[in-house]
Amino acid sequence: MRRLISVVALCALALTTQVLPVTAQALDDPIPRPINKGGPQVRLEPVAIGLTAPNWGISAPGDSNRLFITDQDGILWKIDLASGAKTVFLDVSARLVPLGAFGPGTFDERGLLGLAFHPDYANNGLLYTFTSEPVSGPADFSTMPPGTPANAQSVIAEWQVPNPRTAASVVDPSTRRELLRIDKPQFNHNAGALNFGPDGLLYISLGDGGNADDEGVGHSPQGNAQDPSNVLGDILRIDPAGTNSTNGNYGIPADNPFVGEAGFVPEIWATGFRNPFRFSFDSATGKLWAGDVGQNDIEEVDVVTEGGNFGWRVKEGSFLFDPNGDDPGFVTERSPGEPDGLIDPVAEYDHDEGISVIGGFVYRGDAIPQLRGRYVFGDFARSFEEFGRLFHFRSSGAGQIQEFRLVGQDSLGLKLDGFGQDANGELYVLGNTTGTPFGDTGVVMRIAPRERDNNLEADLNGFAEVDAATGQFGAGDLNGDGLSEIRLRPENERVCFSLRWADIDEPVASHIHSGVVGVNGPIVVDLLSNADNFRHENGEGRANGCAEDVDPELIDDIGNHPGAFYVNIHTSPFPGGAIRGNLERSEVGI
């Protein structure tokens, strides 16, 4: 069913919102009801620090141990979820426009904005990026008048990773292949999300081109978002492996909703958006959820459907919108379901609650059962002077938006830049304290249950020991093995432990060290000297006890990044360590 209304109807709708009767007034408080805190209480666990402005995070198909994070300044990070260690996977910073829309160090919406892995990435190593680049040659799509340069160009590119199943592999920059290039009239409203849908095709979100009210140079008379002859203000659907596009670099699926219709760009899958900066597919239902950033009044969440028109700039959210000539536009009245042919959001809020919606994910993880099936999203900031907010509502119906209750935090304490989702469906909060693509305050935080699972364990063996001189594995007692179980007690500054071992000489020491797999590190907690019970007989034994007066910050660090710490047992024949293993979370406590 063709849901996009005709160009004639769109023009008529635009006229009705520009020439309003004198009784039409701007609404001072479109949605009086506030967003209150409610629902499951959660903790935010730091995973990685020292980024700039992280805005999107996903796992690569077949890789459950890492999260790949786009940083607005041009770095694509590969982050180890156990240790928090980060590696540069791809650096496109040299390709970007100079960031800082109002000068160095200032706010900007351009940069490295999107990432998607090909569904068969584990075999073909293909991935795709969305970047804001300087004008370089003719664009595949442009709304700019002849002789008028664009502010920047939005570029979708394909890259390849050799040996993608190898953990140390990174992107080969020489494999870059450009799919399409789009002129951007202004610096803002880029959108920037990339996702492969359940159908195996690539979906791309584009904003209306920038400026206020979808007006100005590079904007159609009715606004780009209601002009089906250009791609701005739309979500596109393409086949990266195809060749039937005008430039021959990608394919246009034959079942796209507007293929063959005169005056319509055939790449369009849905239209009528202002700035759908983030969208995602629900892994359980396949539905596409998008957060569309509003103008001066309304932020909205949409369930996007094929061929749908989501209203901008005829409407802002479920409210009629008046572009108001040369003055700032405003909403006039709520008009659910009208005009005919426009689709209203499933959730919305006004600017008393936030200024820029950040779309997220429907939670399908296991760690927080009470959150399952809820759409998790947020807002960049309550105001430009305040921090961001985290929201959720039930995805199965007309759920009321609630703000997360955070353990130990009255507020998020960050500008919210985006969300991440790992291979297990667990979600991550991405943000920084500056609200700009500069500095190193960017963080990645896991949304975790209210009560942290403080039970950890490590399987111990001699092969895991690393030679201090050569860095080679196998420096321990290759006949021995063991198990260490750890219970973190931050409330009373204790680390309790149980050690078991077999086929080694009598232990002389045991510790928790700082260090990921394959790396030797310093002692942080002495275990064996704090043992209440110790037994060793015929090469086997056990010990248990609690280390007292341990720094609570260290306990938190171990709990947040168990993979960055290891337990080992020392013997006289192996003073550097007989058996060793890195910590991981355990479902069994001691």
Go through the PLM ranges and name each one:
Residues 25-212, 278-281, 286-297, 353-398, ...:
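Acidic, Gly/Ser/Thr-rich repeat motifs that build Ca2+-stabilized beta-propeller blades
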Residues 451-510, 514-590:
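Metal-centered catalytic cores of metalloenzymes
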Residues 45-46, 85-94, 167-180, 246-257, ...:
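Beta-propeller fold detector
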Residues 273, 399-423:
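Conserved blade-ending motifs and adjacent loop-strand segments that build the rim/top face
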Residues 14-23:
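C-terminal segment of classical bacterial N-terminal signal peptides
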Residues 1-8:
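Bacterial N-terminal signal peptides that target proteins for export
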Residues 24-43, 165-173, 245-261, 323-342:
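Blade/loop signatures of beta-propeller domains
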